[in-house]
């Protein structure tokens, strides 16, 4: 496992990664805001081909755009991040796909959401994002394209673009390569 933009304070024990998210961190490219940010934190491993990332995320997000979840990243211009993002005073399910420029989709979550389970799966050029809250069955949040031939840094992501930072924990982080499907 390796860090992209290692935070000042973090610890991993047993099956929990605890991060104090540094302020002024984010991943974004141009769309709607005009700026480029590539300073968020990612803890994961580089994999090629088909893969799965699964994790439960608990956070105390409270400032606009506080975020934590999963990232698949080929480079600074090609990536996907998904998870909880605090937006307009509420936790939201957020997915950003960046292929040169960022595209952002958000949807509502219960106002008291402090934990979410995520599963992100890449098969060929398709990435499927699923989420669940509590004991609910996983729901499909997004199906997006990422170039199939790219190696990806796959793992836990967090950022605090506007606030003072926050604390987040990642539980049962699982990152696995999958053999290609036989046709």
Predicted regions and their residues:
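Extracellular glycan-recognition regions
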Residues: 1-183
């Amino acid at each position: 496992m390796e860090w992209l933009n290692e935070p000042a304070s973090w610890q991993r024990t047993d099956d929990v990664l605890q991060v104090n998210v540094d302020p002024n961190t984010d991943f974004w490219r141009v769309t709607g805001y005009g700026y480029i940010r590539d300073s968020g934190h990612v803890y994961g491993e580089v994999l090629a081909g088909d893969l799965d990332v699964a994790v439960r995320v608990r956070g105390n997000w409270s400032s606009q755009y506080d975020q934590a979840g999963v990232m698949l990243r080929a480079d600074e211009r090609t990536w996907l991040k998904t998870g909880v993002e605090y937006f307009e005073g509420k936790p939201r399910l957020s997915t950003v796909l960046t292929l040169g420029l960022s595209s952002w989709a958000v949807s509502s979550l219960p106002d008291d959401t402090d934990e979410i389970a995520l599963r992100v799966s890449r098969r060929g050029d398709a990435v499927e994002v699923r989420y669940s809250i509590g004991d609910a069955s996983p729901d499909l949040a997004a199906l997006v394209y990422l170039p199939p031939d790219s190696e990806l840094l796959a793992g836990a992501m967090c950022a605090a673009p506007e606030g003072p930072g926050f604390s987040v924990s990642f539980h049962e982080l699982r990152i696995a390569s999958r053999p290609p499907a036989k046709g």
